[in-house]
């Protein structure tokens, strides 16, 4: 597999590596460079393309250009923390359906607040690389399933069981 390394014109801290034939793109947002590299390397080894950002503000600057399939967010970061970043991503119609995962200490507060703003998954640090990969793959599969259902609904091809509950069709 040929791998090309590219430099972007985005802020200096952003990292992007083009992986021909990549099975998906992940935007990794963490202020700790070592954690960003750890996540990046493990996801790239699984054939995923990874773009990194050092904080939530940088994430919001690049998300529309990067168009990731999944975003991982640390919680405690300078400028804009992960929970406020998640809330802003959910408020934007262009990013509201992107799968979001918090990769952090995952305190009770972080989990409760994350659920309130629409975070899809949580992974506590320190984590096993296999757990990270499994979580990202599951989020990507869920997103693909959501997109397929949305296209079926647009095309008017939604299948239903024909059973009725209160006069309304029941969808599987």
What are these regions (language model features)?
Residues 1-25, 130-172:
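Non-catalytic signal-transmission and effector/linker regions of two-component phosphorelay proteins
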Residues 37-45:
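Charged docking surfaces used in two-component/phosphorelay signaling
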Residues 47-54, 62:
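Short hydrophobic/Thr-rich beta-strand motif most characteristic of the beta2 strand and flanking loop
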Residues 54-58, 69, 81-87:
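Acidic catalytic/metal-coordinating carboxylates
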Residues 66-72:
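Active-site beta3 strand of CheY-like receiver
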Residues 77:
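Receiver (REC) domain active-site loop signature in two-component systems and cognate sites
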Residues 84, 106-123, 130, 134-138:
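Alpha4 helix (beta4-alpha4-beta5 surface) of REC/receiver domains from two-component response regulators
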């Amino acid at each position: 597999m040929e791998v090309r390394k590219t430099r972007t014109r985005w802020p200096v801290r952003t990292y992007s590596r083009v992986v021909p034939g990549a099975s998906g793109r992940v935007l990794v947002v963490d202020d700790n460079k070592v954690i960003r590299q750890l996540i990046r390397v493990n996801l790239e080894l699984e054939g995923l393309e990874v773009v990194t950002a050092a904080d939530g503000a940088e994430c919001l600057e690049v998300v529309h250009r990067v168009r990731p399939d999944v975003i991982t967010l640390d919680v405690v970061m300078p400028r804009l923390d992960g929970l406020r970043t998640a809330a802003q991503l959910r408020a934007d119609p262009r990013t509201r359906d992107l799968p979001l995962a918090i990769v952090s200490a995952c305190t009770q507060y972080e989990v409760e607040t994350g659920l309130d703003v629409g975070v899809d998954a949580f992974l506590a640090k320190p984590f096993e690389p296999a757990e990270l990969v499994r979580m990202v793959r599951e989020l990507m599969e869920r997103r693909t399933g959501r997109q397929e259902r949305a296209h079926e609904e647009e095309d008017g091809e939604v299948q239903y069981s024909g059973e009725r509950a209160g006069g309304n069709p029941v969808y599987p």
